[in-house]
Amino acid sequence: QAESGLTHQDQKRKKNELRRMERREEELLLAIEETEGEEARLREELAKPENYTNHGKAQELSESLDHLHRRHRSLMGEWEELVQHRERLQGELAGA
């Protein structure tokens, strides 16, 4: 058993968990980037005169933008939680 109280098995399990978290973080950052790009594209579409003067099209674009905004917030929340958990785990391993 290590001085920190973590057994070799615990350290191995935590390192595996850390790798999974790092992969998930990469996935989240990519999804966040894609969502931000799509939000920007929809804002540009909504700003076009032919779209904002067409109530149906403007409504559709606004709803899509709302959906993307909610998704972005959700992804950011998950990412922030993941980063905090990852940092705690790294601290535990550093003390091992």
Language-model segment annotations:
Residues Q1-A96:
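Charged, heptad-repeat coiled-coil alpha-helices that serve as long linker/dimerization "arms"
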